[in-house]
């Protein structure tokens, strides 16, 4: 599926918490995700340290912070997509805020992720950036099936086409 008039052309993938993206055990999923993003007409750019593995990512929060800063600096990247959640994104904070570098380089780009990424949503909100609490690369776009879940695909496509998502009103359950 090649989408005409898409808002997002290049997705930058970051590993801000868990480094599983670099492990051999998930490379078949990574391949599926890359193929899906390309079918949507998107270019995929993995940030420099995003695929270094669990140990490296855990031991180097400064490199994770560097990847996020570089994703904002890179004008070819339209959307920043988190690889997956995790449990230690808070370790990036000193590397992002102690010298104000993130504040100096941040500009409006779609930022998408969930779970431990909530910390990133909060810090970007504090800098005036609108973010989307939603899909991650591994958990949603690399879904191990013939296609993505229809609900997930619908809202992801809406985001890359328009740069926004219409308000979703859930139907009430009748119990």
List where the protein language model places each region.
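Long, hydrophobic/aromatic-enriched structural stretches that serve as scaffold segments
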Residues: 71-97
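Short glycine-/acidic-enriched loop or helix-start segments at secondary-structure transitions
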Residues: 23, 89-92, 122-123, 143
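ATP/NTP phosphate-donor binding region
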Residues: 1-76
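Flexible, glycine/proline-enriched loop segments at strand-loop-helix junctions
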Residues: 19-23, 107-111, 137-147
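Conserved anion/nucleotide-ligand pocket segment
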Residues: 130-175
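Gly/Ser/Thr-rich loops at beta-strand to alpha-helix junctions
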Residues: 17-21, 84-89, 112-119
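Short, acidic/small-residue loops that bind anionic groups at enzyme active sites
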Residues: 98-123, 130-137
